Amino acid sequence: PPVFYGAAILILLFAAVVIGFPQRAGEWLLAAQTWASQTVGWYYLLAMTLYLIFVVVTALSGYGKIKLGADHDEPEFSYLSWAGMLFAAGISITLFFFCVSEPLTHFLQPPQGEAGTQEAARQAMELLFLHWGLHGWGVFALVAMALAYFAYRHNLPLALRSALYPLIGKRINGPIGYTVDCFGIIATVFGLGADMGFGVLQLNSGLDYLYAIPHTHPVQMALIVLMMGAAISVAVSGVDKGIRILSDINMLLACSLLLFVLFVGPTQHLLNTLVQNVGDYLGHLPGKSFDLYAYGGPSDWLGSWTVFYWAWWIAWAPFVGLFIARISRGRTIREFVFGVLFIPLGFTLAWMSIFGNSALEQALGGASELSRVAIEQPSMALYQMLQNYPWSRAVITVTVLVSFVFFVTSADSGTVVLSTLSAHGGSADDDGPKWLRVFWGSVTALVTGGLLFAGSIDALKSAVVLTSLPFSLILLLMMWGLHKAFYMESQRQRARSHSLAPLMSGNGKRSGGWKRRLSQAVHFPSRDEVYRFMNDVVRPAISEVSEVFREKGLAVDAQLDPGNASLSLEIGHGEQHRFLYQVLMRGYFTPSFARAGMGGLHLKNRRYFRAEVHLAEGSQDYDLMGYTKEQIINDMLDQYERHLQFLHLVR
């Protein structure tokens, strides 16, 4: 597919340059990042804030009631299971890398104020919360919302380009749409590569502490090959159940590590600072969202930290967004947005606060070695801090093992997402072929290794800032596409209230008087009864109407197989929204009051069936059983007139 070849060629060319000319490539990347932070740093801050505002306002508005799926879809997972999966999405190996090194760096090298003071410590935690807070999950929510909404409600491909359908229509399946997916894949590869790079440095430091394995490029390349090889093996071997169990155990170990640091360390102080950190973060969030240090502060600080973080979150958005979209079908936009924003955020901020304040407490108490390590070798800072706790060697061993498993599970998921987006970018349920997982895993390993050779942490950050820039523009177009689609949803609802026919409950559509109507209401038909009704009454009605529509010159597609439990009429309107009238046979358990009236408990498992009407947006929750052919034709025309009213409103 064009998406695969375009993305693969560009990424491989970049990897070849970085590996072939590592020193010069590192200089180019650093110069480009400096240019980007000085030239478009303001844009990154503005864009990330707009993403967050958009998803929150959408959730709080009337659009928040819209489902990510058809109107009759129910969530696939219980709320508790869904929350657990969102919780897992908030944990990655980078939490281990930055939870100690970042707050100590801000403490010792603050963008404003005097270093090494209580005020510097407070500012450090505020900046840490900013970088790991709502903004990042806002961009994840935006991408996941777009993917789920267009795939599950409008049956478009589960691809990034689908969000532009309201803007460019069927051209999403042409060069414009393929370019969108291509940029998304490129951003994801470099975001995943940065994550893997930080993970390799973190694991190398852990092995150095435990077994004196040195920090060298050959060792790091060996770790990349080992861990990516494990991830690819998991991705292609079909041992999903086993890796899920391992991942669950790993999350329990991570939570145990968090509780260990909380209760073995200065517990009261850590709880106090957690609450204060949350208050400082929320209180200063609006101002910090736009703080460019335009009136003072190190010129390169913003590019190395906030701009990098915003670019990194953007790069990870297709990866995490696709995962969240797949587990969120059937949820309303309101519960989806607030679940995505706050469930994983709670754990992330608790982790950062407890580890960050533990490190700051040691630094303020005179731990000069910890401060030195945080600046000179950030990947070793966590282990240096844990060295001051009881059973430090055992705790650090567990930390290294947990980090390794998080690396493997993240890389495994990343290769699956990349193969899905590049193979077809279409099926909402199927992943890409296994060979593509091997390919993208290998390419990501090449990119990671090349960037580590080209300049380690600085090169990783620079590549992310540059490759995320085009995709950040696409996210703004996604917002526009979603807004336009939601507006059309509201107009569709408005059109329903403008029916040109009388209300069904009051126009005598059910013939035979009130006694027959009552008998029909308390009758619970069998499967065979509904089959006969659909074959003898519904099918002729749809057939007759479809012939008339064809005579009028409209594009009609009627599915009238009498052996199928589904009959449908579809009318095309060119580039405008199609009209779909579908009758589906649906089965339900007979209610208890009816079972009692039909002879008692021996009928408790009896099912009854309905001939339900579905439109393009899903079930309309009413049953046609008992209607005559003329009444069904009138109902089709009622719905078609509502559809024409909707098309009129959105022109």
Task: Go through each PLM region and give its residues.
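Transmembrane-helix boundary/entry motifs in multi-pass membrane transporters
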Residues: P1-P2, S37-W42, D71-A89, A124-L134, ...
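N-terminal alpha-helical transmembrane segments of multi-pass membrane transport
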Residues: P1-A120, F486
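Loop-to-transmembrane helix boundary motifs in multi-pass membrane proteins
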Residues: P1-I11, G169-Y178, I213-I232, V236, ...
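Flexible loop linkers connecting adjacent transmembrane helices
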Residues: E27-Q33, L60-Y79, L104-L127, Y149-P175, ...
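Membrane-interface loop-to-helix entry segments
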Residues: G6, S37-Y43, A47-L50, V180-T188, ...
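Extracellular/periplasmic helix-exit of transmembrane alpha-helices
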Residues: F98-P110, V261-H284, L345-Q377
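Helix-loop-helix module between adjacent transmembrane segments
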Residues: P2-I19, L52-V56, I91-L95, L130-L201, ...
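Membrane-water interface regions at transmembrane-helix termini and the short interhelical loops
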Residues: F21-A36, V55-E76, A124-H131, A146-L156, ...
